[in-house]
Amino acid sequence: MTATQPPVALGGNFLVSPLDEATLFTRERFTDDHRDIEKMVRDFASERVRPNRDALESRNQELALTLLREMGELGLLGIDVPEAYGGMELDKITTAIVAESMGRSYSASFSVVYSVQTGIGMLPVLWFGTPAQKERYLPRLVTGEWIGAYALTEPSAGSDALSGKCGATLSEDGRYYLLNGEKQFITNAAWADLFTVFAQVNGSQFSAFLVERTTPGLTVGAEEKKMGVKGSSTCPVVLKEARVPVENLLYEVGKGATIAFNALNLGRFKLAASDLGGSKAVFEEAVRYAKGRRQFAQAIANFDVIKGKVADMAVRIFAADSMIYRTIGLIQQAVDRLDPAAADYYVQMGEATERYAMEASMAKVVGSETLGMVTDHGVQILGGYGFIEEFPMAGPYRDTRIDRIWEGTNEINRQIVAGTVMKRAILEELPIRTQIRAIDAFLDDEPEAAGGALVAERAALEAGKRLALSIL
């Protein structure tokens, strides 16, 4: 960070500081390049993915991987990856734009395949891999030649991921780690060539390994029969004396939590952005139907109850949109302060996202619950037709339910939000305790509101912050 640059706000700073319009990122600040990429991805989603939705939902592996590799040819699998490894290394704002635009494809299954490939299936290697690991795996992942998967969850370790029983012991000759255990609900598993597997070294050191599909001792189980996202692959992965070369240890022994949670932070954010795109697509279908469906000699869009649902959907979508792009703007500011020439640049990048783990969890909760609400309203607006598979609500209604479970359940993400606030208050990283000590005066004084538009609304927002802090 140079002397002329102001410090980047820590996650949660919005609770103790007024809005800073100079650093508040919104979609209105997209560059021309951002808009060009947005159009390209939307066109791909509408022309290549959506027309093939039915085939993709039948778990057509050949079609899904063909489309994924087409995205690779467009450079869309390597947005975060340096050119040296075949990527484009665009900014983090672009990752949000692409995720949102793919969410409009009306194929949650394909969006899941894409999201895992470019997120938790690739970022651990990019952020924490050795030069040799990056050279071996990233060029294959960014083209779609190889498919990535992320093996963290176990039958007895879901939300409590660090309690996993999968073990790793060093072989007598010191050349291999022998992995034993079972992983559950692994997305992309049946198609994956590379698994990021988490295991306890010597029973207590949570670590990560890059495990190739051809590794002796690794077996992919049968496909799960799921409620939704039926076109994606979800299988258990069993490891029995799986021989993983010591060179495939990712980062360091005992650093698995750092890898897991940094990858999940951005994964949660990307899921939120994808859900935002899905919400907008469902909203458009619901409004289109309401304007065309006539009952009692008029379009049902004229009825106040339908207008109320449309308004509720629009409010939630706007709130999610604002939160998501404000958060990615903060992450981008933090990344911009890093030195790309630093040997640990990508480790620092992962750590930069951790600064906003709270906001990523908030975005995940708001994004997934917005899509759930919007889809539910969409079904209701379509009435009986909303329950019929040929109409555009039944599939999304099933598909969206998983978004409140994976990438950390929404209950766990709410705990992360509350825990982060408490932790940063105790460590005095945020001046929350200082303000709480003066709580009487803090509540008695009227909050000052800046001039200009929305004066009353800004004052109400600041008052709301004071009220929230008073509860602490």
Spans of model-derived segments:
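Glycine-rich phosphate/pyrophosphate-binding beta-alpha loops
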Residues: 157-158, 184-190, 266, 402-407
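Amphipathic, small/basic residue-rich leader segments at the start of a protein or domain
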Residues: 1-115, 128, 132-136, 140, ...
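C-terminal helix-coil-helix/basic helical segment that borders enzyme active sites and/or dimer interfaces
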Residues: 50-58, 295, 318-366, 379-382
